[in-house]
Design a protein with these regions (language model features):
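N-terminal charged helix/coil linker that caps or initiates catalytic domains
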Residues: 1-26
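Glycine-rich phosphate/adenylate-binding loop
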Residues: 2, 109-114, 121-126, 136, ...
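Conserved N-terminal Rossmann-fold NAD(P)-binding element of oxidoreductases
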Residues: 27-29, 52
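Hydrophobic/small residue at the entry helix of a nucleotide-binding pocket
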Residues: 33-34
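Conserved S-adenosyl-L-methionine
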Residues: 42-48, 136
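Glycine-rich phosphate-binding loop and adjoining beta1-alpha1-beta2 segment
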Residues: 51-89
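Conserved SAM/SAH-binding loop
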Residues: 98-106
Length: 237
């Protein structure tokens, strides 16, 4: 009998689809990268999704974030994601946490309940906390490095953090992870040199912020889809 996942089942098989439907995956960061990861996970039949993001949808998100439309501006990103997931798969269980995951909030959550964890947040402190807690709980984790100021989606690849080059965020993460005794981590990263955004300093100064990275609809989205694809392949084995 046909179902909404019939075409995926043709590739993965019924046993793998059952595993995906029983799986519980946490996604940290539901922005340009994480939003597309969530989309692909939902469309692949993941049964339970836990979403973590403290931010709300804003006008400047529309150029790259799948959850951002003029109708969702002002909504919590996790709430917008929950609505979208249920529109895709009404049977999915979605737990939405509008929190900023960091050392001071980490104790609220038990990572051992997850089958896989995706790190798609921007801050080094938060990323390190997620990765350390995932490893401590013996839960597979995959992390996304920088996607801002890039135009070439074909430069994205999946590798171990120890093999990354060029990406400044990956360099910082390698150093900080080594300090914590972590030498291996599956990541999505780009070999493209970061471009210099035009007029970014002026815009940042006007907003009273640090330099704002440029972004596109396709590089963060491609990274998110790669994250989800790796999770689906691993969970369906």
């Amino acid at each position: 009998m046909q179902s909404q996942f019939s075409r995926t089942e043709l590739l993965l098989g019924s046993s793998a689809m059952e595993r995906l439907q029983k799986a519980r995956v946490a996604v940290f960061g539901i922005g340009g990268v994480g939003g597309y990861a969530v989309e692909a996970l939902a469309r692949s039949g993941i049964g339970t999704l836990d979403l973590f993001d403290h931010d709300t949808v804003s006008l400047t998100n529309i150029n790259r974030q799948i959850l951002a439309t003029h109708e969702t501006i002002g909504m919590k990103k996790v709430d917008a994601a929950k609505c979208r997931i249920h529109a895709i798969n009404p049977k999915a269980v979605v737990n939405a946490y509008p929190v900023f995951y960091a050392p001071d909030t980490a104790d609220q959550f038990d990572f051992s309940v997850y089958d896989y964890i995706i790190d798609a947040i921007d801050t080094v402190t938060g990323k390190l906390c997620i990765i350390q807690n995932a490893i401590a709980a013996n839960v597979p984790v995959i992390s996304c490095m920088g996607t801002g100021n890039k135009l070439d989606a074909s430069a994205l690849q999946i590798t171990d953090i120890s093999k990354t080059t060029i990406c400044p965020l990956a360099r910082i993460m390698r150093k900080e992870l080594r300090k914590r005794g972590i030498n291996r981590l599956k990541v999505v990263y780009s070999t493209e040199e970061a471009l210099t955004p035009v007029g970014a300093e002026e815009e940042a100064a006007a907003l009273g912020k640090r330099t704002i990275p440029g972004s596109t609809a396709f590089v963060p989205g491609a990274a998110g889809l790669m994250l989800a694809g790796e999770v689906i392949r691993d969970l369906s084995k």
